[in-house]
C-alpha cells in the first residue's frame, strides 16, 4: 500500500554552492532513482513573519545559431507531482504545536513550539502516550530537531542557539550557535541540515556544529522559501512548506526541487478543531520504508 514516487534522471539545473573549507566534489553526491514511500503524518513557528525570499538568478549561455536545421532539444523536465495514500493513522496530542518529528527504534521523538509551551518529548505511536518530556525555557520558542550519535539536536526560532540533549535521559548536555533564525533540522550520514524559513538549506558539520556549506532551493528558476520542518529520505531532503499542504522533495546537492507531494485533504474537515493549524512534521522509518506526517495541533499522525 505504499506510494511509488519516480524521480526524473534528467533536467537537473546545477546551482552554485557556497563552501567553507570543502570542495563541491566532496560536499554531497546527488542521488536520483526510485523512491518508495508509505505516508504517515504529524513543526515551525506559528506567528512567524515571512522570511527572506531568496530568488535565484541563473545565466544560460545562448547556443550559436545553427547553419542547418536541427532537431529541437527536449523540453526541460519539471518536478514530479505526487499525491498520497493513507496506510494508517495514529493518535497525536491535539495540543502539540509540532515543530520537529523523528522516528527512532519504534518511537516518535517530537519537539513542540510557542513561548511558554515548547517541549521535547518521546511518544508511543500506537497510543499517543507521552513517555518522556522536558519543558524548554518559557522565553524560548522551540523549533525542529534531529537525532544522531545518541544525541538530540534542537534549534530555536530567534535565539540563534541550539540545544543538545542526551537521547536517553533528555538531559541538556550542550549548546551550539548559528546566525539568524532556526526552523527545521534534519540529518544524513554527513551533515546536520538546517532551514531558516528562507529558500536556503545550511549544512552543519555534526562534530563542530559549524556551517560548512549551503544551497539555494529553487523550482523553475525561482527560489522556494518558507522551508520549514525537514527530513532526509533516500537521498533527498523533504521539506514542509510553511502554511501550505505541500512537501518539497529537494536534491541536496543542487537545491533543485525534484518533486512535490500534495497532501491537501489529508486531514478531513470533521477532524479539525478550533485550534488546528498547518501541516508540519515529517518522520521516516528507514528500516520499514515508512513515511509519517502530522501538523500543528493535529489529532493524528498519518502513515
Q: What residue ranges belong to the model's regions?
A:
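C-terminal motif of bacterial Sec signal peptides marking the signal peptidase cleavage site
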Residues: 40-43
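Conserved beta-strand positions in repeat-built beta-propeller and related beta-rich domains
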Residues: 109-114, 152-159, 194-198, 239-243, ...
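Short loop/turn segments that connect beta-strands within beta-propeller blades
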Residues: 123-128, 166-170, 206-209, 251-255
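Short, low-complexity, disordered segments immediately C-terminal to signal peptides
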Residues: 45-71
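Beta-rich, blade/repeat-based domains predominating
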Residues: 94-105, 138-148, 178-191, 221-235, ...
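A short beta-strand motif characteristic of beta-propeller blades
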Residues: 86-91, 129-135, 171-176, 213-222, ...
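A short helix->beta-strand "capping" segment at the edge of beta-propeller domains
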Residues: 72-95, 125-131
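Beta-strand-rich domains and repeat architectures in extracellular enzymes and scaffolds
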Residues: 87-119, 134-146, 295-297
